[in-house]
Every structure is written in C-alpha cells, then in structure tokens.
Regions:
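Long, highly charged, low-complexity intrinsically disordered interaction regions
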Residues: 42-48, 106-124, 472-570, 590-616, ...
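Duplex nucleic acid-engaging cores and interfaces of nucleic-acid transaction enzymes
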Residues: 78, 94-97, 104-373, 379-477, ...
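Generic start-of-chain signal for non-secretory N-termini
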Residues: 34-64, 71
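Low-complexity, acidic/Ser/Thr- and charged residue-rich accessory regions of DNA metabolism proteins
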Residues: 189-195, 205, 302-306, 311-325, ...
C-alpha cells in the first residue's frame, strides 16, 4: 500500500537543497501577490532557469516562480490550480518537469562541486580545466573531464608507469609526425632486464613499446573529446545484438525468448519493450546482449583524432588506438549505452504504467448506491457482501454455483432475499474465475431488471484483502470478505478504493519488475496525487489512505483527521481542520481547496474555491446586491459579475475564471458519467469465439505495441498496434486508453498456443495467421490462459499484465527483424 508519498519526500529534499544553496526569500503564500520577485531577487541559478525555460518553451520568470513555490513547500496540484498567475498557467506536467529538471541540475552542481574540491585538494586544478568544469552542463561531460584525474585502481598503464615507461610514451606522442624517428631504438633505452625490483623490470624492446602503448591507450580512453565522439558514434551507429547462449536453444523456458535467439536492431530505434524483453532474457540466463558500432569505424575514429601522420611513431599510436577501443573505451561505452538505453526504456515503461494507472483511477464511479458485491469462484464458492451507500458492510455469506439443484436454489434464494432486504441498487461481480458463469446465473434468477449487473476488475483485490489497511477496516472478517468488499467499493468509487492498493498490484504496467523501482514509485505516487486532487476529497467520509494523498497532507495528518472526526463528529467547516493536531497553516493552505464538506456551514466549503478567496467571492455577491447562497444558486446573478473589475495585484483573470467556473458547478466531479457495460451473451470462453465475430470489450492494458482487451472469455485478446485503426498508429495510447469501451473483431483464435488476436479496423483481415514457430516465436503472442482466468494476480506471474510471463515477451517481440 502506498503510505509514504515519494513526492513529499522529494519535496522535503527540494526544500532542504533550496534553503542551503538557493537562499530563497520568504514570501507568504497565504497572501499571494502578482508582484513576484525577479529571478535575480530570488537568487536562483539563472543559467538553470533559462535552460529549463528553453526546454519547456515557457518564460524564465515562470520557471523561477515554480521553483520558488516548491522551495516554500507547495505541491504540484496546489501550484497548478491556485498559483496560475505566478506560473503563467503551467499545467501539472510542466510544473513536474520544472521540479525534476531542477533536481537534476542540482545533482550536476553537487557533482561539480565535489570534482572541483577533489582537484583542488590534489593541486590538479588549472584555470583552463576549471573553466571547462564550470561550463559542463551534464553529468556525462563532468565525468569525462574528470576521467584523467580520477584516482585509479592498478591498471596496465599504471604498471607501465611504475616501470618508468611514461617518458617513452611521451616521446612517441611528441615524435609521431617525424618519419625519421625510431621508436624501437628509443625503446632500447628503457630495457631493464636486470632491475632489482621485479615491478621495474623491462625485459626487452617489445615490452617497453607495449607498456608505452598501454599508457597512450589509457590517455585516449580518458580524453574527453575522444569519449564524446565515441559516444556519438555509439548513439548513431550502435547496434543491439542478441544471441542465445550455447546449450540453451532447446530449453523449454528459453522458448519465450526465441525471437531474440539471433536478433539485431539499431540502438537508436529499438522500442523500449523490446529492449526490456532482451534484457530480461539476459538476466534469466538465456540470451547474451551486446551493444556496439562497426569496429572499423570505432578504431578509425580514435586513430583519426590521435594522429594523421604516416611514420613509425604514428604506427605505435594506431596500435594503441585499436587496443584502447577493444580493451578500454569500447567496453566502457558499451556499459554506458546499456545503462542509457535501460534508462530510456525505463522512462517509457514507467510513463505507460502511469498513463494506464491514471485512466483506471479516473474511471467513472457508480456513486453512492447500495451495492451487492460478488467475488466469484467454483470450488470455494462465491463470496457475497452487501454494502450501504457509504460503502459500509451490512451482510456477508457464501453461495455455491456447482453441485445439486438444491444448492443452486439456495443460492438463488439468498441473493433474492439480500437484494430485497438491503434495497440493492447494483451488483458488482469480480472478473476472475467463474465470473461469466456467475453473471449468467445472476441474470437468470429473476432479479429486478433495473438493477444493473456489472463486471469489475478484481486486480489487486487479493493484495488489499491481506493488507494492514484491510485488517484495520475489517478485523473480524477474513480475506475473502475483504476482497469482496473491495470489488463492490471499486464499482462505487474506483479512486477511493484503489488508493489502498499498491499500484504495481493493479496490473496495468509494462515490465514493472524490471524498471527502476524508485523511478516507478515516484511516478506512480505523482499520478495518484494528481488524480486524487483533481477529483477532490469529501472530508467527512474519506479514508485515511485517500486523505494521505491530498495536497499538503501526509499519513500522520490523515490519521489525525480521522481520529478527530471519530472523536468530534463530522467537520462543519474547512477552518475546523486547524484544530486537528499537528496540522498547521501551511498544510491547511495546501490542502483546503481540495477538500469538500457536503453539508458545510459555509457554501464555498462544498466547492474547489480556496478559502483565501472567500472574501473575494463574498465581495462579488455584495457588489451585485445579493447573498452568497443566491449568487451560487442563480445563474442570472453570476452573469452580472464583471471579472475584470476584480483583477488586482493579488488575483488575475485565470484565477477569477476558475472561481466563476466553480461557482457555476460547485464541487463538480471531472470524471465521466457511469455507463453500464455488458459483454456479448453466449460468449464466455475462448472456445465460443469465431473468426469475424464482432464483440464489445474493455481495454485492460495499453502498451507501445498494442492494447489488451477483455472480451469476457477469461482471457484478454491483443489488438496489435497495426490493427488499432485504418490509419497508421505510432503509439497505441494515441488511440485507446485503459477502461475504454471498444468494439473489436476476432481475427485469430489459437487455442493450443492460447492466443486471441483482435482488430479495431473497419475492414479487418480475417485470414488465419500462420505461426512462424513454436510458442514464443513471432505472430504477436497473447496473454496465456491461467487457472485464475487470465485475470491479473499479485506479483509478476503469468496472470499479471506486464508483470512477467511469456505472453508479454511474445507480444512485445512482434516486429520485423
């Protein structure tokens, strides 16, 4: 469960670094002003601000304002909604980008300071070197500049230096243009076969020249210009090559990586999912991956930068260049490219996960209705719960849909009585094992037609049911009851319930266990924070898990709010929050606008208008001769308000327009209206599918290569990116989103290989695709059937979308070699 918000930890780190190095002036955000200090007045690194402004296409003063607001403890949602004038109306994406780039540049500055200190302490810092280090704008450039001076372990070059061969290396470099210079003759001066110390012995000319070349090769490897040129060569001409390890070709577990047994692709164009698939094959011991440019081009690059002469000395330089690439610079650059390509793939995979999670969290809520929740099952039975409109558990029991007719009659009687007794308004059925069978049974027992029966994703429900949160909520019930409650509540309000589950257990990510876990957690936490505050939170009913994601609040604040609420009853006003222990003015300022009180004493407490603007709205009402409630309830009165009259040093038109929009629809929910969805009747298992069949479906996952769609057969089908539209589609997320309802056509059903291929084209090709090999080899593989009905489970097993298993590797590998 996400209890600690990385965004808050990042915020504290940002504030600490700002207070130490940026020296921000104190400005009260409780009294915001459009008269914002200049960048120079803020004492911000102007170069950083200007660079970020160029990258994002915004004004430098707005970047400085965002940085200042962060240093004062403001959050991304607060800045985006309530400080539009200061930021030039930046959205959350750009505000987050400013934060992240400021952190990156702070890291560069920290490393710069460390390098300068190291060089100064060793008396190695020249004015020219200091100037280069000061101007370096990336960690890569800094490390290249520092490479020749970095304390080294014992290398072939240091061994040669200990033998006294550095002067010979200097001589070769100095005389490389002299055709008459004789390196062999010069090397004879350094031959010392009888030296008392073995570490200083040089037995012959060959050893002397070899040692000199070792020194020269290391100099090439440490040269910042050569490293930069080689890096560009790798980026432009590098190829990712994948080979199967000897003896692994027939390994059953290796079959899922068969596409990559002999694969090569340009580094600059390889998709993230393919890079991650190859890396997984390597980590599991089936593949070997290399990243290299053409060797001749690489050695020629070093030779060309080292010497252009034709002489015996130049020949030694060229030999050193070849050795440098094969032994030093090549392996170093390959490692760097592997790391950089991994970072790029991680970033894209994390973005896919975050985008999918956002769609899932912002799915349309049913609302406050009495719901019957059913967690279906065969052998263990179907767990049934009844909840009131606030999500409180009223009843629980188990029914069995297999066995004698008497068992089915008992199940029918129980459901009928529960629906009638508790005035059930909707039925939620988990979409796991036995879901379609349970749905069919419920639809046939004669319940009122106006009660919708809705399939709900149960991904992560088992994780919630075994969590501390669930045990705290339902200490007297077992995991089966808790899981059923979670399914029912997800129908009522997906956002409020899903925040209790670790997003990685929800199953909407891509290679989630392979990517950088800190980066993944930070991005997902940012996404949850954005969604929670974008929707707003009802203060008197929200769980402490939901409250902990409100802007400005943490888990301690949330727990204290719930404790205060339990002890003193419902909050009657936002201002009452200030009575909560350890919740101060700053937390109140950041949180208040995102908290709603449905039955508040002050009408604006039900809206997203911030308390700092209440006086302004009351002045609007006074100026047109009405009360505040009248202004809120009568559109004709609001139409009389001239917003331009209220522009001041504190408030601009963007904020005024936001206020008026909120007055028009106080506390509006930005999520879509709920619509009942039904799968195709009579299509409940893969064997029911036929080529050309058109079916309704729900998108469950979106990846770069396509979208997975639930069509109600316990197994998601894949709509490959080439089948998403009649037009060319580069990225599946441009066409479909998680939880989107779509119409698909079945174009392939391969039961032995457990694959379903779908199309969203207006005229799809129904021709049966012929497999190019055994499972795992081409053909756009699908998610494998599992005992859980193909539904996502905890962890990275076969049933977890993007969490692991051969189905993903197969699907991800589809493409032309």
């Amino acid at each position: 469960m996400l209890r600690i918000k990385s965004s808050n930890l990042r915020q504290e780190k940002f504030q600490a670094s700002a207070s130490l190095s940026l020296r921000w002036p104190v400005v009260s955000l409780l009294q915001p002003s459009l008269k914002f200090p200049s960048i120079m007045e803020l004492r911000i690194n102007v170069a950083h601000v200007e660079r970020i402004a160029r990258e994002l296409g915004v004004k430098a003063i707005h970047v400085g304002a965002v940085a200042h607001l962060f240093s004062e403890g403001s959050t991304v949602p607060f800045i985006a909604r309530y400080r539009k004038e200061q930021t030039g109306e930046m959205d959350e994406v750009k505000i987050t980008a400013v934060r992240d780039r400021m952190e990156q540049m702070q890291a560069i500055d920290d490393r710069r300071s460390s390098i300068l200190k190291s060089l100064e302490e060793r008396n190695l810092l020249t004015d020219a070197l200091k100037d280069k280090i000061t101007k370096a704008d990336s960690l890569t450039v800094l490390e290249d500049l520092f490479a020749p001076y970095r304390p080294k372990r014992r290398t072939r070059a240091t061994i040669a230096k200990d033998k006294g061969l550095e002067p010979l290396a200097d001589w070769i470099e100095a005389n490389q243009s002299d055709r008459s210079a004789n390196p062999t003759a010069e090397a004879e001066k350094y031959v010392k076969p009888d030296a008392e110390n073995d570490e200083q012995k040089v037995k012959d000319v060959a050893e002397a020249l070899g040692g000199a070349r070792d020194i020269i090769a290391e100099r090439f490897s440490d040269n910042a210009e050569i490293r930069a040129a080689m890096r560009k060569l790798y980026q432009d001409q590098g190829t990712v090559t994948s080979k199967v390890l000897y003896g692994k070709e027939e390994d059953a577990e290796a079959a899922k990586f068969r596409d990559y047994f002999d694969w090569n692709e340009p580094l600059k164009t390889i998709p993230s999912h393919r890079m991650l698939a190859i890396r997984r094959g390597e980590s599991e011991g089936f593949l070997m991956m290399r990243v290299n440019p053409p060797e001749l081009n690489a050695t020629a690059l070093i030779e060309g930068m080292a010497t252009r002469a034709i002489s015996p000395g130049a020949d030694q330089m060229k030999l050193a260049a070849t050795d440098c690439y094969k032994r030093l610079l090549g392996p170093s650059m390959e490692t760097e490219m592997r790391l950089e390509s991994k970072k790029k793939a991680d970033a894209e995979a994390v973005k896919v996960f975050a985008d999918n999670l956002r769609e899932l969290l912002l799915a349309a809520p049913l609302g406050q209705k009495r719901v019957l929740g059913i967690d279906p099952g065969f052998r263990t039975g179907c767990k049934v719960v009844a909840l009131d409109a606030q999500g409180k558990l009223l009843f629980n029991d188990v029914i069995y849909l297999i066995g004698s007719g008497n068992t089915l009659m008992q199940a029918k009687e129980l459901l009928t009585n529960v629906v009638k007794h508790y005035h059930i308004e909707a039925i939620a059925i988990g979409n796991g094992t036995a879901s379609r069978e349970t749905e069919s049974f419920v639809n046939k027992i004669g319940l009122p037609k106006h009660i919708p029966v809705i399939m709900v994703s149960e991904a992560g429900a088992s994780v919630y049911s075994a969590s501390d949160v669930a045990r705290e909520e339902f200490p007297d019930h077992d995991v089966t009851v808790r899981g059923s409650v979670s399914i029912a509540r997800r129908l009522m309000d997906p956002l409020s319930e899903l925040v209790k589950v670790d997003p990685k257990a929800i199953g909407v990510g891509q290679y989630q266990h392979d990517v950088d876990q800190n980066q993944l957690k930070a991005s997902l936490d940012d996404t949850v924070l954005s969604c929670v505050n974008g929707v707003g939170v009802e203060l008197n009913t929200a769980s402490k898990q939901l409250l902990s994601y409100v802007s400005g609040l943490n888990s301690t604040h949330a727990a204290n709010i719930v404790a205060y609420r339990n002890e003193n009853g419902a909050f009657k006003s936002r201002r009452e929050l200030l009575k909560v222990p350890r919740l101060g003015d700053k937390a109140f300022e950041q949180a208040a606008g995102f908290l709603r009180i449905r039955d508040a004493e002050h009408p604006l407490d039900r809206s997203a208008v911030h308390p700092e603007r209440y006086a302004l709205v009351e002045q609007m009402a006074s100026d047109i001769g009405c009360t505040l409630p009248e202004l809120l309830s009568k559109p004709e009165l609001r139409a009389k308000v001239d917003l331009k009259k209220y522009v001041s040093a504190d408030v601009g038109l963007p904020t005024l327009q936001d206020i008026m929009n909120e007055l028009n629809k106080p506390g509006r929910d930005p999520r879509k209206q709920f619509e009942v969805f039904h799968f195709q009747e009579g299509v409940e298992k893969p064997e029911d599918l036929q080529i050309g069949m058109k079916l309704p479906g729900i998108v469950t996952n979106v990846a770069a290569f396509g979208a997975f769609v639930d069509i109600g057969v316990h197994q998601d089908g894949l709509v490959h990116v080439s089948q998403l539209s009649d037009n060319f589609v580069k990225d599946a997320s441009e066409v479909v989103k998680v939880a989107q309802r779509v119409q698909v056509t079945v174009i392939e059903v391969d039961l032995p290989r457990k694959r379903i291929a779908l199309s969203m084209k207006s005229k799809p090709d129904f021709e049966k695709k012929k497999p190019s090999g055994p499972p795992g080899q081409g053909g756009g593989g699908q998610r494998s059937f599992s005992s859980s009905g193909g539904r996502p489970q905890q962890g990275g097993g076969m049933g977890n979308p993007f969490g692991g298993g051969d189905w993903f590797t197969q699907a991800a590998s589809k493409g032309k070699k």
